UniProtKB/Swiss-Prot annotation:
It comes from the Bacteria. Belongs to the PyrI family. Binds 1 zinc ion per subunit. GO terms for biological process: 'de novo' pyrimidine nucleobase biosynthetic process; pyrimidine nucleotide biosynthetic process. HAMAP family: Asp_carb_tr_reg (MF_00002). GO terms for cellular component: aspartate carbamoyltransferase complex. Contains catalytic and regulatory chains. This is Aspartate carbamoyltransferase regulatory chain. The gene is pyrI. It comes from Parabacteroides distasonis (strain ATCC 8503 / DSM 20701 / CIP 104284 / JCM 5825 / NCTC 11152). GO terms for molecular function: metal ion binding. InterPro entries: Asp_carbamoyltransf_reg_N, Asp_carbamoylTrfase_reg, Asp_carbamoyltrfase_reg_C, Asp_carbatrfase_reg_C_sf, Asp_carbatrfase_reg_N_sf.
């Protein structure tokens, strides 16, 4: 990155870590809470309402020396699908991927059916994603459909 380009940055560049970009502003603090950022000792930068040609405005989180596991990424996808995850090493983006819901969620979501076996026995919940755009999921065991707004993340 050129010296002139660095002067234009609104948020400091990361040497190593993860930048979560294109977070809808209304979801930024939900994402931060879901990731447990308040418990991390890493350097964290959170910015909201940055100008975005793609979205109008966006949120961003940068976490130094943190690289997320698959289940952490899947948690983010449940509340803010289509965000961009940038993996940074030595100030360079080495991997960039759009976060999408996987086809199946295991142990990440609580079924909101009180009679579901997953709420009455010591077992992991299992959901099939039936509509990635709307964020609709269906319990594997009781077949209850849950809309994105009603998802309870464990």
């Amino acid at each position: 990155m050129s010296a002139e380009k660095k002067k234009e940055l609104q948020v400091a560049a990361l040497e190593n870590g993860t930048a979560i970009d294109h977070i809808p502003p209304s979801q930024l603090f939900k994402v931060a809470s879901l990731l447990g950022l308040e418990k991390m000792n890493n350097t964290i930068t959170i910015g909201n309402n940055f100008h975005s040609n793609k979205m109008g405005c966006k949120g961003m989180i940068k976490i130094a020396d943190k690289f997320f596991e698959e289940d952490e990424i899947n948690r983010i996808a449940m509340i803010a699908p289509n965000i961009i995850l940038n993996i940074i090493r030595d100030y360079e983006v080495v991997e960039k991927k759009t976060v999408t819901l996987p086809d199946e969620l295991i142990g990440l979501v609580k079924c909101n059916n009180p009679k579901c076996i997953t709420n009455n026995e010591p077992m992991l919940s299992r959901f099939h994603v039936i509509d990635k755009e709307k964020g609709t999921i269906k319990c594997h065991y009781c077949e209850r459909k849950i809309n994105k707004e009603d998802i309870i993340i464990k």
